[in-house]
Curated annotation (Swiss-Prot):
Gene3D superfamilies: UbiA prenyltransferase (1.10.357.140). It catalyses: heme b + (2E,6E)-farnesyl diphosphate + H2O = Fe(II)-heme o + diphosphate. Pathway: Porphyrin-containing compound metabolism; heme O biosynthesis; heme O from protoheme: step 1/1. This is Protoheme IX farnesyltransferase. NCBIfam families: cyoE_ctaB (TIGR01473), PRK04375.1-2 (NF003349). It comes from Bartonella quintana (strain Toulouse) (Rochalimaea quintana). The lineage of its organism: Bacteria, Pseudomonadati, Pseudomonadota, Alphaproteobacteria, Hyphomicrobiales. One of its GO terms (molecular function) is protoheme IX farnesyltransferase activity. Carbon 2 of the heme B porphyrin ring is defined according to the Fischer nomenclature.
Length: 311
């Protein structure tokens, strides 16, 4: 599956658009990668076993490379639908700046390199978990689920939830209940995040033939499920405090953030006009980005304060 666009000069001869380093960086999905790296870092730092800072850096680098490689392969496979959607039509492959072949090779090299580096320098359990995450994101989500079911991001969301477990595995050689709770928070966060996006981008998804929840089940059902998963997410977010993995600082601030998230989801559910729905969907979407970063940030700050100041 290769998508290519070319320009023409005055004589009608085709001229491939020029590609630069920025286009290759764009293929890595840097915004998504930054969240992957951050959540993996938290999983690594708060694990019960300390890791040498140099090896910790290498582990996070491997996760970043693997996440970037997965992003490239996702853009490679989705180039046809990216060309249709307004939000994605200017990405490097559909715009013709990078050929599908180059993108595929780039993504495969990064993905394999990340796994081999993780196994060689860190441990093979973390490497296998990283390889499984890349496989899950590309094969299970991108190729199998995304174009077939409105539950695509519910199941496929597991791929984005694995990084904290990989971080923990890099430090300890295994996974534990703490890393699973971090996985669960991201897993439950994914549906409200992406379905709120799909509410104000439903025409785009519909034109591309992607069966997102609003296009298949309707707006009302989508809003109800956003509220439902938001509640499940906030329960999951309380988990670290309940099992004494996090302290009172985390409990207070995560509760405040969770209440705000539920408020936005409730307002979205009650919105009875198109304009009100779009407005609340955008507010819910953008707050969800802040929420996840803040939850993990609070957990990290609390751990560092306890480790370096109190102990």
């Amino acid at each position: 599956m290769f998508v290519s666009r070319e320009l023409s000069d005055a004589s009608g001869k085709s001229i491939p658009p020029k590609s630069g380093i920025y286009d290759y960086i764009t293929l890595l999905k840097p915004r998504v990668m930054s969240l992957v790296v951050f959540t993996a870092l938290v999983g690594l730092v708060v694990s019960p076993v300390s890791i040498n800072p140099w090896y910790g850096f290498l582990a996070i680098l491997c996760i970043a490379i693997g996440g970037g490689g997965a992003g490239v392969l996702n853009m490679w496979y989705d180039a046809d639908i990216d060309a249709v959607m307004k939000r994605t039509k200017n990405r490097p492959i559909p715009s013709g700046k990078i050929s599908s072949r180059k993108a595929f090779v780039f993504g495969m090299v990064l993905s394999m390199l990340s796994v081999l580096m993780m196994g060689k320098f860190i441990n093979w359990f973390a490497a296998l978990l990283l390889a499984f995450t890349i496989f899950f994101y590309i094969v299970i989500y991108t190729i199998w689920l995304k174009r077939r079911t409105p539950q695509n991001i519910v199941i496929g969301g597991a791929a984005g939830a694995f990084p904290p477990m990989i971080g923990c595995a890099a430090a300890t050689g295994t996974v534990n209940i703490e890393s699973f709770l971090l996985f669960l928070i991201i897993f439950m966060w994914t549906p409200p995040h992406f379905w709120s996006l799909s509410l104000f981008s439903s025409l785009d998804y519909g034109a591309a033939g992607i069966p997102m929840m609003p296009n298949v089940r309707g707006e009302r059902s989508t809003k109800k499920q956003i509220l439902f998963y938001t509640i499940l997410m906030t329960i999951s977010a309380a988990g670290p405090f309940i099992i004494d993995f996090a302290g009172i600082f985390y409990a207070i601030f995560s509760t405040i953030l969770s209440v705000i998230f539920i408020y936005f989801a409730y307002r979205l559910w009650k919105a009875d006009t198109y304009d009100a729905t779009i407005l609340m969907a955008k507010k819910t979407f953008f707050f969800s980005l802040f929420y996840l970063a803040a939850i993990f940030g609070i957990l990290l700050i609390e751990f560092l304060v306890w480790y370096f100041i109190i102990l």
